[in-house]
Amino acid sequence: MKILILGAGQVGSTLARYLCLDDDNDITIVDQKEEMLTPLQRHLDIKTVNGYGAYPSVLEKAGIKSMDVVIAVMNSDERNMVACRMAHTLYDVKKKIARIRTTEYLLRPEIFTNDALPIDFLITPENLITEYIRGIVEEPGASQVFDFENGLVQLVETRAFVGTPIVNRPIKELQEHMPDVKMRIVSLYRNERAIPAKSDTVIREGDQVYFLAKKNHISRALKEFRRAENDYHKIFIAGGGSIGLNVAQLLEDSHNIRIIELGEERAKYLSEKLNNTIVLQGNASDEDLLKDEGIENTDLFLALTDSDEVNVIVSILAKRLGAHKTIALVKRDVYASLAEQSGDVDIIVSPDQITVSGILSHLRKGDCMKVHSLQHGKSEAIEIVVHGDEKTSEVIGEQIKDLPLPEGVVVGAVVRDNELLMGSKKLVIESGDHILMVLMDVRKIHEVEALFLENEQ
């Protein structure tokens, strides 16, 4: 696939790195700043073009006439919209994806049409990140939570702790412990190495486990891997930007929320927008302020400022002052590494990985509803809808055990008529099924796409 990325910022460069894992992708990236392109050209097999991504002359230099997809992730919504307009009007590019963050535009979906602003898919990072954080807040004990089939089923990442029921026991015993719980382990990592999640695989302390489960069964399933955690009630948010405000609005009716914002005008704005949240104007690294506001009784501390450095520092401070759990929003790898090494940041949220996952679902062939990138882009969880009949589809009418799946691809579950069916070997695939799979190696995606595509008669 020939892909043109406009903007080599954090999202654009991360997307380029992820897409380069697939040798079949031919990637070109455009940016006005040469210094943003140099490291990408040095480390990745891509073409770079220095210039303004909305100018026709620059687009033509980048080879837009032969592109299958244009992805506009420049640091301006207006630039992204103009670039997509150019791609559509002048070059008839079939698929245009743009990052749009301004609420004023998002509230008027009628402007995103072929007659106005021809953008096929809108990516709104703040909304994606807010929903991602909501999933973690709703499931204490989970490191990551990914929705499939409108939240009916979720993929959960957690770690196995010593002294819990399944540690040092084979996976097959899970069903004995929880006969009424719909869940299945689909992926397992030990010391950063993938381990086949077979029925006789023994779970060890510290294993990173991914399991699929019905939403209302997740809390029960988590107890198999770690000590039960109480729900989060008192939540402290550092940073009142778009994400901090969105999270507070989402949670304030069901949780005790405090939000701290450095800017006086912004703090005033937050107090007008939030109904059941205590807004504090001050510095999130102010130890006395945190103590005065009862940080030692805080169930969850969310560091959501625009600064990686601030998020890491205030998370460490909050944990050492008594906060039960800390989550930090971190873009750059160097700060993510520091946060992990500190031992005081429980969960690191990568906004770029979340945004990239939102984009990837629009790049897959077939009827791909959801894509979630795992393990820094090396693995992937996907939801594909099956179409056709036994004549036009290689999978319809086949049992899961008979599917010619590539090595390392696991069918974890099937959603049929809004009912969750776990991926048992004898389950027969039907038209309309939503297949939930995990690919241990993202490079297998083309084999999976080809298998599930409906063939023309």
Summary of predicted features, one role per range:
Residues M1-Q457:
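Cytosolic regulatory regions of ion transport systems
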